[in-house]
Amino acid sequence: MKYFLLFLLTIALTACSLFGRYITAKEFGAAYPFTVDGYLECEPPGAIVFKGGGKVYAVNGTAENKGYPKIDPIWKDDPTNPGLKINIGDVLTEGRKLCKP
């Protein structure tokens, strides 16, 4: 029984990382749009979420429609364009890759 529970735990932890990856400011450089590093994940059917700073945020409209809060609290302002945010396109592209089987 103990081995069976260990097996189930291993499967569950593996499944959690199948559709996600850790992203960082170091990886993206100045183009990194968030104030914290964290996990970018895809939840079927195409909801891209970001887990960072102890919370889960919607990165796209599909995730917002599933009830996740907007990413705005951790989305950096663009220092070269006052009133705008840093482009989130590269993160969306990476998220879409995670959504493909």
Question: Model regions: which residues?
Answer:
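Short, intrinsically disordered, charge-biased short linear motifs at domain edges
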Residues: 2-3, 28-31, 84-86
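Sec-dependent N-terminal signal peptides
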Residues: 3-13
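Cys/His-rich metal-chelating microdomains
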Residues: 19
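C-terminal partner/receptor-binding element of secreted or periplasmic proteins
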Residues: 68-101
